[in-house]
Amino acid sequence: MKELKRVILKLSGEALSGEAKSGYDDALIEDIAHQVKKIVEKGIDVGVVIGGGNYWRGRSNDNIDRTKADQIGMLATVMNCIYTADAFRVFKTNILTPFECGSMTKLFSKDRANKYFEKGMVVFFAGGTGHPYFSTDTGIVLRAIELDADAILLAKAIDGVYDSDPKINPAAKKYDTLPIQEVVDKK
């Protein structure tokens, strides 16, 4: 197996809330910070993408335009990154977004992210891709490709891939394996 030099960690917003299903579980976030510290101490760059599901599930709300719902979701990821980066006090951190957020974050650029990694910082990527209709799962893949990450690590509040949302559909089918062609055919 290739030696890892850079990884991007994806935390679902729901995973941050633990059993509460909203807000934050501080003990859990502290544990995540200690796990990330072990990775950083091995000389591996760590980027973090966090979802917004502990605050906003826009796709489940028919009372708002999808674009606006996704924009609210992007802002939820910014809130989660600000909170979590503060909890990661054992590191120097920075938060990058694909859109301006005043003084709370910095605007994403590949060069800026690489400079932060060179300084040993844990870099948080908030706001997804900055465009509606794309999940933070898309954002993590985009950032991983842009930044030549060796791996994407997922920490989500779900145990696999399903044909529909198992929280909404109790009869959702879990896939043990899922060939890419099957995904393409189902689209």
Per-segment meaning from a language model:
Residues 61-123, 138:
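Ligand-binding beta-strand-loop-alpha-helix segment within the catalytic cores
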Residues 28, 32-35, 128-131, 172-187:
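Polyanion-binding loop/helix "lid" in catalytic or ligand-binding cores
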Residues 1-46:
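N-terminal glycine-/serine-/threonine-rich phosphate-binding loop
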Residues 15-17, 53-58, 102-103, 131-132, ...:
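Short, active-site-adjacent cap segments at secondary-structure transitions
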Residues 8-12, 50-51, 96, 125-127, ...:
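Short beta-strand segments
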Residues 50-66:
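Short, charge-patterned binding micro-sites
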Residues 43-47, 120-123:
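Loop/turn-to-beta-strand initiation segments
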Residues 89, 111-163:
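Internal active-site segments that recognize and position negatively charged phosphoryl groups
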